Structure formats: structure tokens, C-alpha cells
């Protein structure tokens, strides 16, 4: 089961599918969502319908959390290269800054992904847009500084040991 703050609402995000948007002001540091569901290895993830694969979140080298429902409000967080939210641990999202009503709640998938299960052309439109989101973006040195303390634990350990 995923959770979305009552200060946000999941709805259509145009070409991006579904997203979560603030319906009340959200303060920096507030918990805005958490991911849940069942943990599956990549081999099982690959057998699920495409939408469910795209809504999974990688939590370890070969483990992905998948929602029990095809779409839950708490799993509608899109990627941005300049995100409004960041990961705390493997499954909790917190506001990185104050978020105004109407703003989309986003996080950078580089902070949790190390595989190609959800690679795509980025359309975030920010000044720091990487153009393509890949499972290897976590290796970019600039992101180590930008997202210090916001990487999923398995990636934080890799960064500490490899870089």
C-alpha cells in the first residue's frame, strides 16, 4: 500500500500519465508520500504489465516494490531533474523545499534506480535536465553532491564504496 499526503492529489499529468499535485501548501521537510507493496526480483517485475513496471521503485540491487493495485495515489510521483521532493531511506518522500498549491510533487529517479527497467527521454524542461533518464544516472558525480543524503540506502552504500 502506498501513501500520499492529504495535502496532495493524484491526477492526470498530461503526456507524463499521472502525477501528484499539491492542493495545500507543503513545507520543506514534510513527508509527502511513501511507497509500499510487495517486493519482487527483476525477473518477476519483467512479467508484470508495463504500467505496473513503470510504477515500481527499485529498493535494492535486484528488488523492486510493486503496488498491489495497478495505480494507487501514493505511487504517482514523476521524475524531474530539479525535483520538489527527495527520498529518505528507500521508501519515504519528503519535500526538499516549500511546495506551492498546484505544483507537481516530483523526485529524481537517479536516487533509487540502478537498472534499465524504466529508462526514458526526460521531459521535465528544467535548466539542469539530463535529456534521458537512465539506470546509471546515480553514478554522475554532480548528483552525489546535489542529492547527498537522499539516495536509497543500497545506492548510498555503493557511492560511499565506489566513488
Predicted segments, located by residue:
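Catalytic cores of histone-lysine modification enzymes
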Residues: 1-86
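C-terminal SET catalytic tail plus cysteine-rich post-SET Zn-binding segment of SAM-dependent SET-domain
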Residues: 79-163
Amino acid at each position: 500500500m502506498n501513501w500520499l499526503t492529504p495535502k496532495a492529489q493524484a491526477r492526470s499529468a498530461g503526456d507524463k500519465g499521472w502525477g501528484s499535485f499539491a492542493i495545500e501548501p507543503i513545507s520543506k521537510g514534510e513527508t509527502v508520500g511513501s511507497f509500499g507493496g510487495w517486493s519482487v526480483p527483476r525477473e518477476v517485475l519483467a512479467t508484470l504489465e508495463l504500467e505496473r513496471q513503470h510504477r515500481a521503485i527499485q529498493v535494492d540491487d535486484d528488488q523492486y516494490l510493486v503496488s498491489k493495485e495497478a495505480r494507487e495515489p501514493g505511487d504517482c510521483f514523476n521524475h524531474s531533474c530539479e525535483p520538489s521532493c527527495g527520498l529518505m531511506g528507500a521508501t519515504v518522500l519528503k519535500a526538499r523545499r516549500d511546495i506551492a498549491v498546484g505544483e507537481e510533487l516530483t523526485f529524481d529517479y537517479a536516487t533509487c534506480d540502478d537498472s534499465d527497467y524504466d529508462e526514458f527521454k526526460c521531459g521535465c524542461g528544467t535548466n539542469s535536465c539530463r535529456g534521458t533518464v537512465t539506470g546509471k544516472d546515480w553514478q554522475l558525480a554532480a548528483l552525489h553532491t546535489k542529492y547527498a543524503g537522499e539516495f536509497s540506502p543500497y545506492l548510498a552504500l555503493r557511492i560511499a564504496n565506489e566513488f
